[in-house]
């Protein structure tokens, strides 16, 4: 007989998880009033520490969302972090800003950095 026992994470484990990009996204943001859940490939991509990352992708695979979520998380986890979205066209870049703003709006107020610039092409936090 197999018994599954749920163990509550310790405060240290929660802090360590939230200090990662994927943990922050999944622990601090929501989609449709439910915690954000990333696919395994999104977690793997976000946690990659390589200086340069290249992706050969098709459309509608969730990478635009992952890029926006990663930029938002790093802006909150790292001081003086800057993310630049280079896209096929301006509308595609604006879409990533919209995703980041949507996730920012779902974060607990106590965790939100102050939003000092908010327009269609830029978000700046202090």
Predicted ranges, named:
Residues 2-126:
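Phosphate/NTP-binding elements of NTP-utilizing enzymes
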């Amino acid at each position: 007989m197999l018994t599954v026992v749920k163990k509550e994470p310790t405060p240290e484990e929660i802090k360590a998880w939230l200090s990662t990009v994927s943990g922050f996204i999944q622990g601090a943001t929501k989609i449709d009033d439910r915690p954000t859940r990333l696919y395994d490939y999104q977690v793997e991509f976000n946690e990659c520490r390589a200086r340069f990352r290249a992706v050969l992708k098709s459309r509608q695979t969730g990478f635009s969302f992952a890029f926006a979520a990663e930029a938002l998380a790093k802006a909150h986890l790292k001081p003086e972090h800057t993310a630049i979205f280079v896209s096929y066209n301006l509308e595609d870049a604006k879409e990533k800003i919209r995703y980041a703003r949507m996730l920012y709006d779902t974060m607990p107020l106590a965790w939100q950095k102050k939003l000092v610039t908010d327009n269609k092409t830029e978000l700046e936090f202090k």
